[in-house]
Each structure stands twice: as C-alpha cells, then as structure tokens.
C-alpha cells in the first residue's frame, strides 16, 4: 500500500524529493533544485503520518532506504550524491527541462 502511494506521488509531479526536514543532504538537494529554478514537490517523511511506511515502500521499490530520494520525470535518480553528480556532469538541467520542471528553459530558435 505504501509503495503504491509513493508511486502515485511520483507520477503526480514532474520532480519529487522524498525528504526529512532535519536532513542536511535533503536540504542541499532542495536548495540545488531551487537555485536551478525547478518546480518540485517535497514530501517530508518525518511530518507525514505514514512517512515511515512510505520510506519502507520506497526502499522496496527502489532499493534505496535513505533520503533524499529524488525522482525526475517519474524516474528514480537517487540521493544527494547522485543528484549533485548529475549537476556537475551537466545532465541535471536537461533532465529537469525535459520533465517540464524548469519553465522557459526549453530549446528555442531565434528568428
């Protein structure tokens, strides 16, 4: 049931960060996404009544029990290191743009 709820959340938004309010790695990922101008949904598992069940469902689904647990365009990205590495490699913004999370950053041709 919790895995199904996690999947529904992931499928309802272009970018989802499963997080905990006190986690410094979660804060880092959310700040990075904000700096890039990305729209995202943060699900704070420590404030959700069924947060621990959702976290268990995520672990069963993705093999990752830790937070942050990042999804872009319905695809599991991973945690803080994976997200930061994508950004360092220049791959995060294109993923966010493709998912529709960054408005006005689509490829345009000048006339």
From Swiss-Prot:
Taxonomy, superkingdom: Eukaryota
GN (gene name): GRXC2
Role played: Has a glutathione-disulfide oxidoreductase activity in the presence of NADPH and glutathione reductase. Reduces low molecular weight disulfides and proteins.
Annotated protein name in UniProt: Glutaredoxin-C2
InterPro entries per the UniProt record, alphabetical: GLR_AS (IPR011767), Glutaredoxin (IPR002109), Glutaredoxin_euk/vir (IPR011899), Glutaredoxin_subgr (IPR014025), Thioredoxin-like_sf (IPR036249)
Source organism per UniProt: Arabidopsis thaliana (Mouse-ear cress)
UniProt cross-references to Gene3D superfamilies, sorted A to Z: Glutaredoxin
Family listed: Belongs to the glutaredoxin family. CPYC subfamily.
Single GO cellular component term: cytoplasm
Residue ranges annotated for the Glutaredoxin domain, each copy included: 3-103
Cystine crosslinks: 23-26
Subcellular location per the Swiss-Prot or TrEMBL entry: Cytoplasm
PANTHER family: GLUTAREDOXIN 2, GLUTAREDOXIN-C2
Keywords: Cytoplasm, Disulfide bond, Electron transport, Redox-active center, Transport
Pfam families per record: Glutaredoxin
């Amino acid at each position: 049931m919790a895995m199904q709820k996690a999947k529904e959340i992931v499928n309802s938004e272009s970018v989802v960060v499963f997080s905990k309010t006190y986690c410094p790695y979660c804060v880092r990922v959310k700040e990075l996404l904000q700096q890039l101008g990305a729209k995202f949904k943060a699900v704070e598992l420590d404030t959700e009544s069924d947060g621990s069940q959702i976290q268990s469902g995520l672990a069963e689904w993705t093999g990752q029990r830790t937070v942050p647990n990042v999804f872009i365009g319905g695809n599991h990205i991973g945690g803080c290191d994976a997200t930061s590495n994508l950004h360092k490699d220049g791959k995060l913004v294109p993923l966010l743009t493709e998912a529709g999370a960054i408005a006005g950053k689509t490829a345009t041709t000048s006339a």
